[in-house]
From Swiss-Prot:
One of its GO terms (molecular function) is protein-disulfide reductase activity. It comes from the Archaea. Transmembrane segments: none annotated. Does not function as a glutathione-disulfide oxidoreductase in the presence of glutathione and glutathione reductase. Has low thioredoxin activity in vitro. Pfam families: Thioredoxin_3. Belongs to the glutaredoxin family. This is Thioredoxin. The keyword Signal does not apply. It comes from Methanothermobacter thermautotrophicus (strain ATCC 29096 / DSM 1053 / JCM 10044 / NBRC 100330 / Delta H).
């Protein structure tokens, strides 16, 4: 099972990134577990300098912007 981590404090951009990621996973039919990481120490430990962020299986893929559903689908496939 793929693990997708959404880094953010719950802001509108963070929520949009999560929505796009969930839609991408659904459209691709991927079995994935989502984890929201809101604690600033964990966000900094992951190496993020801007929010929101998205990691796949612990590897940071997106930082500081809201990726489109199509971009996320490319990352996941």
């Amino acid at each position: 099972m793929m693990k997708i981590q959404i880094y953010g404090t719950g802001c509108a951009n963070c929520q949009m990134l999560e929505k796009n990621a969930r839609e991408a996973v659904k459209e691709l039919g991927i079995d994935a577990e989502f984890e929201k990481i809101k604690e600033m120490d964990q966000i900094l430990e992951a190496g993020l300098t801007a929010l929101p962020g998205l990691a796949v299986d612990g590897e940071l893929k997106i930082m500081g912007r809201v990726a489109s559903k199509e971009e996320i689908k490319k990352i996941l496939s």
